[in-house]
């Protein structure tokens, strides 16, 4: 793992709102969850080529909102992985979807798995609570 300077976490909003410290940083992630869910609902009602690539993207957007919200509840190096993991889970299928639409449908489909696979690496190095 690449070490992160602990000063990185001092940007977090320090105000309390609705009983939550870092309130605006936490609550500002709700739109990601909403947009991701809306995308999944939209996909369910439309015939979209490579729909599963775009479904993976929208799941990643939901995970971005949840992971970033979790990180901002208590900003620390130990929770930062959840903030970044959601984003990379959205980026990989997004790029695979662009490749599928602009280069080759089969190439985009084949690339989703290998592009998502590196996301599993940080999970093996998460710090254990004692």
Regions found by a protein language model. Give the residues of each.
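Early transmembrane hairpin module of multi-pass membrane proteins
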Residues: 1-112, 124
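Terminal transmembrane helical module of multi-pass membrane proteins
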Residues: 110-111, 118-130
């Amino acid at each position: 793992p690449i070490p992160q300077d602990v000063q990185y976490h001092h940007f977090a909003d320090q105000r309390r709102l609705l009983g939550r410290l870092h309130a605006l940083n936490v609550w500002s992630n709700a739109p990601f969850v909403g947009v991701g869910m809306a995308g999944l609902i939209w996909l369910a009602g439309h015939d979209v080529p490579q729909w599963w690539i775009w479904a993976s993207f929208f799941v990643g957007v939901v995970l971005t909102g949840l992971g970033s919200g979790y990180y901002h509840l208590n900003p620390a190096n130990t929770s930062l992985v959840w903030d970044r993991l959601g984003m990379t889970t959205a980026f990989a299928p997004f790029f695979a979807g662009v490749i599928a639409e602009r280069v080759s449908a089969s190439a985009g489909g084949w690339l989703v798995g290998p592009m998502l696979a590196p996301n599993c690496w940080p999970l093996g190095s998460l710090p254990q609570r004692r």
